[in-house]
Amino acid sequence: MKWVSALSRQTDIDGAIQEAAESITQQLGSDQADLTIVFVSPQFKEFYDKVPDLISRYFKPGLVFGCSGGGIIGNGEEAEQQAAISITSAQLPGVKIQPLQFETTELPDQDTSPSVWREWLQVQVEDNPHFVFLADPFSFQGEEFLAGVDFAYPNSKKVGGLASGAQALGGNALYLGNKIYNSGLVGIALSGDIEVDTIVAQGCRPIGEPMQITQCEQTLLKELEGKPPLKVLEELHETLSDADKKLLQTSLFLGIEMDPMKDSPKQGDFLIRNLMGVDRESGGLGIGALLRNGQLV
């Protein structure tokens, strides 16, 4: 088993993929991989559909899997707010890689048995699979999906994240094989000679006080306790230290209460979600999760 990674900051899509792909083949010592994971910055959104074919032009990638991303990480480097592509490839002898793709409209009912979820995913629990999922936050109900997968595969590891870089539905890219999707979820189930360890990649320190959502529409947060979210942030900004004011500009996230039955939620009781954009006309915020009125954030 071998994993290698490369990142290119070239501003030309062909040149960026060629540079990253040549680094991959050099590190692998081969032009053949079993799995290739690709992340593409939104500066290349006009060329999202070219990515799988371009990768295949330079080496045999195996199954291509990935998505668009506002920040791109590869080979120990990170690129934000600039053109970038990262490619991670693996040679995985003895590992079964099963591609998965779903839309929220297809989800089984939450009250169904584990066997119904397993039949729907078409992944054998006896294979002891581990999962990697990438979802579009504007169209996919990730919490409901993960609750069902946890129910059906309690001993399996599940890792992944949200596609980003877009401000609205249809603007992100999800890659699976030679296909590109603009909504839903793509994933892979890994089984056989492989172990998966999980870590939490992101932790946050709370600022301000918990507030209740009083108006929202899908992923758009319109109102917090009667105020536009942007107004809440402006008021919060005035109370922060200079260091936190700088962090507010680049590292702001929203915490969503995980268990509404808790009387006094504390740090650690909130699910961290990305801010996807700002509607300055209404003062609303785009959030990387489907919201509902009454949630505490």
Annotate the PLM regions.
Residues 1-49, 54-57, 62-63, 67-72, ...:
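Small-residue-enriched flexible segments
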